[in-house]
Amino acid sequence: MKRLSFFLFLCFAVSTNAQSIYRTACQGNIERLDSLLVSTDINTQDQRGRTLLHWAVGCTKKAMFEHLIEKGIQIDVPDNEGATPLYMAVRFQNLELFDRLVDLLPNTDWKMNSGGKLFEKAILNRDLSFVQKLTELGVPLDVTTTKGSTPLEIALRIQADSISNWLEAHGANKNLIRLVEAKGPYLGQQPPQLEAKLFAPNFISTEEYEFGSVFNTAGDEFFYGVDLGGRNVIRYSKLSKGVWSKPETILSHEKYGYNDPFLSPDENRLYFISNQALDGLGDPKDIDIWYVERQGEGWSAPINAGPNINSKSEEYYISFTEEGTMYFASDKNQNHHDIYYSKYKGGRFMEAVKLGPAINTEAYEADVYVDPKETYLIFCAQREGGLGRGDLYISFKDKEGNWTPSVNMGDNVNTQGHELCPFVTADGKYLFYTSRQDIYWISTTVFESLRP
């Protein structure tokens, strides 16, 4: 599952795949809900750990919210990512339901247990009123997040000036702000083994939603996507004289989103996906694959990858073999995404070919990374028996040149959440991917136990 047009689903909009009882809560149909509760526990949780109360808050259904409270639903259950209904009220900027939940909570432990996470979301929303509300309720101004960031540090990092000014004026401790630098190979991070590690915390992996990362072959350029409240941008950091530059945004637009960066084999093009109109002026359209070309120290205007790649449906994620064959995902002529490849000949891409049943199923397959030598590929899929909402799977080429049946990469990589956006470094040593809205990495020795 991706961002852009799918972002609203990830943030609680109703999906056709949502189970009936959760869809009913989101629609606010109390009569229908009661009929379903005859055979379902009121504290049921969906695949992401969300309760009916999460859905009522996320879909802003006050009457449904009150009905669930009256029927005795638990009010402080966290989902798989630790988000409670109280957090959802902050996320969706619903002050009325937030106040109601605060009144219902049995004690004030939430101020220390969840205060950092609530401040974080309020600041990412650039919602000064919620920052003020949390302060009025007694949440400490210098409470920290799981990454050790104070509200003031977060506000300064994302340049939420009105919030940082207000926090400073009300006594936030400036001495707690950390200045994070990155030096040397892999941004100075200690390489992981068989346990995935958060990559470059508080420099790359911050309180924002980062995903879709790629290094160049030399390892001195790093590109990645960031979700800014539903609008996606691509950021860039460069190693110079041993120090990595502060990440800067190189592709953004007030109307369109850009994400899933990937370099062409010669590294003169940066490919990505976008909902940009073909003329660069109209309303956002379906998601296509685009690229920009290097021009000195900058980049050209976005160029559409053309009709042999793109369709009237949506195309996602890009990776390349050494010969320039592009692997990507598309949902053209179908109701779910599958993985395709397109050979590059004579300066253009050939008609795309869908991979066979060893890779594609009736489920969702996307976010494909192909080894440059085409010996294995890794992709995201949503399949029965998976560990979470979306898992990474791997397939290897056999001696006859066929893809082996893909297998789940297991709990060294996958979690109860959503794993996506795989990339393997040019030295073949590390797998990068997105998990829990951050970028993680792990040693590729994890592949060995997965080979057929």
Regions found by a protein language model. Name each.
Residues 177-452:
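Short, conserved micro-motifs composed of acidic
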Residues 29-37, 61-69, 94-103, 127-135, ...:
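Ankyrin repeat structural motif
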Residues 1-21:
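Bacterial Sec-dependent N-terminal signal peptides
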Residues 19-21, 45-52, 78-84, 111-120, ...:
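Ankyrin-repeat boundary/"N-cap" motif
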Residues 23-28, 55-61, 88-94, 121-127, ...:
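Ankyrin repeat A-helix N-terminal signature
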Residues 20-23, 104, 157, 161-179:
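Ankyrin-repeat-protein effector appendages
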